């Protein structure tokens, strides 16, 4: 079957925002206007098309990235609706990795919120061009220009309106397009009855006068903001700059082309206005997706490495190139089993054919290829460059794996996975649940790389870790619903880490003689602290074979196994460099096991002088409270070992930004509610790991049954 839409007419976009900014409702309206659905489902009624999991419909939030395909004015738009809740940040990250552009949805009353900052930072890391949609213009307190100021103040983003709203709150009646200088005035609730007029024309004046608006004021405002738009875009386009300084009129097509170029280069962020719930501005937002966000042809060729030669390689977006794709999500479907979502960067792929998973070095057969619309599916025979689809039948593929033509191997840049910050103990309620729980947890961990399952070596308990209480709550809930496993769940615990704060060298010597073959392993290892977030690095600096080459991997393995159960309180150790530089062996008695034990002994010896420290997750906390409660909040932060970072006024509220240890935030919602009579709110996002104070460290060590020395 031939390609239905050309690459130039394809858009792969994400819709991302802070929780409750209205992303899913915006996506619903897109599906309605593009003819994908014929009845609009409301998120707050639990009827949304994109929120298809039972938990999503009950909680009114988006947990997984639902993918769907829509068509708009002769273009194919693949849309991924991503969660805004911080606990599901991996869903945003893996979506951004495979998208070409994104729509950032803001709540026009609040502007940029904490999770907006997080997703914006992630999008910047991946170089994703964005347009901004100021949603909820009909809401009490909606302020388009305040939202614009927060983009600059909180994100440092070069955002400029390409539209301005007519009215706000209950009086939000339309939008002026600053590029075309036309207005859209909505005369019915479905947003389908639209009056389009030229700004400043008699018709425009009459329409606004009939609705009690001052047309002259809006004409002036539109001219002023158009001038600012041209001035801003002139920085990125010499032709426009020349025309602007010469006082010449700038044609619509030229202005559009200049905005598109600056947006694709991630120099400029066009800002739009609307109310998805009231069906206003969504069609204009869709037009902006086509006009200003890139097609797969507009972005640089995807970079990778040839696994055979270790040389850099790339794949331009073309059907003629060898097949290359990235698996960005694994999901278990109750009807078809394991689904692997993938983005095709180059080449084509037919159902029933074979691909090579270059990340794992395994051949995989593509059973069926499905095009997804939330949780319904359409079977297709072929996928082309630029497509997003799901494959059935991939047994070994996990998130971040590269799938390529067997004759043209390439490993594409993978997806970075954040470390879990919270953990809890789970145990099956009955013996019958025991085996089922193991299978269920394994399947859930396959789907979600930020979800870890471990067994405590000392107690034999199963410990699950994730990005937050809601994250683990949803996964335990899924275990019950999808796998019919009943489990008892312990109280949430902080996922502490351990590290070394000083450099040292230590010897690990292991010798055992008990008749027959003995054991002999002897190593000298230099330990130094690594950069934060850099993880564990092992270097083999052995010269002259004093430790035979075949035993070196055992030394590394011994260190890794020891680090899994740290030296102070049994927490995983991170950010340490280890250099094996000397040792000795015995011709007969040396073995892998002996060197593994020797490495473990060296690390435990090093702990005596390497100043081991316990690290705790620090959360970036944003607390919004009425002015009269500000004093209480400052007290809350200080009492929780927190540090106030900044404060700002927003209307009659105060916004406090602070860093607070996660350990001190359990139960804070109740404290805040009672001290503000329910008027205060807070959001927290994981920021970094930091050393715990000595007194707290001693408490943690004592609690874990270790000695503080």
UniProtKB/Swiss-Prot annotation:
Assigned GO CC terms: cytoplasm
Pfam families assigned to the protein according to its UniProt record, in alphabetical order: EF-G_D2 (PF22042), EFG_C (PF00679), EFG_III (PF14492), EFG_IV (PF03764), GTP_EFTU (PF00009)
Subcellular location: Cytoplasm
Keyword Kinase: no
GO molecular function, one term: GTPase activity
Database matches in SUPFAM superfamilies: EF-G C-terminal domain-like, P-loop containing nucleoside triphosphate hydrolases, Ribosomal protein S5 domain 2-like, Translation proteins
Gene Ontology biological-process annotations: ribosome disassembly
Binding-site residues, GTP: 17-24, 81-85, 135-138
Domain (tr-type G): residue spans on this chain: 8-297
Family from the record: Belongs to the TRAFAC class translation factor GTPase superfamily. Classic translation factor GTPase family. EF-G/EF-2 subfamily.
Official protein name in the record: Elongation factor G
Gene source species: Lactococcus lactis subsp. lactis (strain IL1403)
This protein's encoding gene: fusA
